[in-house]
Amino acid sequence: MDKSLFEQARPILEQIQDNGFEAYYVGGSVRDYVMGRNIHDIDITTSATPDEIESIFSHTIPVGKEHGTINVVFNDENYEVTTFRAEEDYVDHRRPSGVTFVRDLYEDLQRRDFTMNAIAMDTANKLYDYFDGQQDINNRIIRTVGIAEERFQEDALRMIRCLRFQSQLSFDIATETFEAMRTQMADIKFLSIERIVIELTKLMRGINVEKSFNHLKSLKAFNYMPYFEHLDMNQINVTEPIDLELLIAIVSVKFDINYSLKPLKLSNRQVKDINQYIQIMNALPSIITKEQLKMFVYDYDTNLIKNVMVAADVLKANDIQGHEPLIVNLQTIDETLHRLPMHNRKDMMVNGGVLMAHLNAKSGPWLKDLLRQIEIAIVTGKVSNEETEILKWVDNHVKI
């Protein structure tokens, strides 16, 4: 088990303790330590207030000081150090109206979401587990700390996080926790879609995504999410991990819709990937010749092509026609990509200026069409990517 990240952070805890305060590792890192999983991020909780943390360390960043969180920069790494706190009443099912700093570890841990995330550990690797988190981990159960309805009323995102953890960890959800989700799922409509998308992205990549996705449907979670709320998501099936962007593309192809993606507030890159996924899925079934395969590999991101091909079972489960394996497979994609004479239009040895000068013509719609014709001719091997050869080909094959 890799404990090196704990060791790297140990001097921070020791320095806090040397100044008379308590300090512990907490949250996901401790959960993963107990499970024997790789540890990625270290979170630290302490009885010291933010002001006291800033006085102890020379290099700090007040990233969320009003909520008790200070980033301590140590050996060029950022560590989140958060003061023990009790939270006041929540507003809009998503954030506390205020926080009160406390000096008691138990009081801090009891406000956390799930028992598996409410375990603290000191520098001697002693665990502080007031809510039987280790027992739930051993039994592979996700259970809220305390009363489930109260935890979900505080922050409705915890319901989506619960399903995300189920997908990632292949845990079951405690009956009382699941029933509270059933009665309170409508509260996710109060959340920002950005927070939901972050959780869905992780959920869709989890090893147990099929079960969690089915729970999203049975709990009617999609009814309260922008974009998805207008669709019958019960018709969508996910049988293995895929990107969220691919899911959205599958939905678009399955229902033959062209809804705006703006309600999901995705990045430009995500929108671009979704549109490419749609084009790839529409193009795949019609590829029957080597020339078509060359243009297909040239026109689209090969990583996205491979993602679609690997997800063939998901496409089939949604009645979307896939590729012809004898013509299009991972090997032929790689071989075709390797043999392409160029990989984008910037590699082409002529441009619009050269063509206008050669043909003594002004710019117009013809130019875009001609550049595409040349592109196709080069990629499919009809002409070599050399200026003189291209211009000869233009003279012999093109009329404007």
Swiss-Prot record:
Residues binding ATP are G28, R31, R112, D155, R158, R161, R164
Per UniProt, Mg(2+) binds at D41, D43
Sample GO molecular function, one term: tRNA binding
Q: Which InterPro entries match?
A: Bact_CCA-adding_enz_type3_sf, CCA-adding_enz_C, CCA-adding_enz_firmicutes, NT_sf, PolA_pol_head_dom, PolyA_RNA-bd
Cofactor names from the entry are: Mg(2+)
According to the UniProt entry, what is the EC number of this protein?
2.7.7.72
Instruction: Tell me if Hydrolase is a UniProt keyword of this record.
Output: no
**Signal peptide from the UniProt entry:** none
Identify the CDD domains for this entry.
NT_ClassII-CCAase
Instruction: Could you list this entry's UniProt keywords, alphabetically sorted.
Output: ATP-binding, Magnesium, Metal-binding, Nucleotide-binding, Nucleotidyltransferase, RNA repair, RNA-binding, Transferase, tRNA processing
Reaction equation(s) it catalyzes: a tRNA precursor + 2 CTP + ATP = a tRNA with a 3' CCA end + 3 diphosphate; a tRNA with a 3' CCA end + 2 CTP + ATP = a tRNA with a 3' CCACCA end + 3 diphosphate
Give the GO terms filed under biological process for this record: RNA repair; tRNA 3'-terminal CCA addition
Specify whether Cell wall biogenesis/degradation is a keyword of the entry: no
A Pfam family this protein belongs to? PolyA_pol_RNAbd
Q: Which residues bind CTP?
A: G28, R31, R112, D155, R158, R161, R164
Q: Which PANTHER family match?
A: CCA TRNA NUCLEOTIDYLTRANSFERASE 1, MITOCHONDRIAL
Q: What else is known?
A: A single active site specifically recognizes both ATP and CTP and is responsible for their addition.
* Subunit details: Homodimer.
Would you identify the family this protein belongs to, as annotated? Belongs to the tRNA nucleotidyltransferase/poly(A) polymerase family. Bacterial CCA-adding enzyme type 3 subfamily.
The family database entries (HAMAP family) matched by this protein are listed as: CCA_bact_type3
Describe its function: Catalyzes the addition and repair of the essential 3'-terminal CCA sequence in tRNAs without using a nucleic acid template. Adds these three nucleotides in the order of C, C, and A to the tRNA nucleotide-73, using CTP and ATP as substrates and producing inorganic pyrophosphate. tRNA 3'-terminal CCA addition is required both for tRNA processing and repair. Also involved in tRNA surveillance by mediating tandem CCA addition to generate a CCACCA at the 3' terminus of unstable tRNAs. While stable tRNAs receive only 3'-terminal CCA, unstable tRNAs are marked with CCACCA and rapidly degraded.
Entry-linked NCBIfam families: PRK13299.1
Record protein name field: CCA-adding enzyme
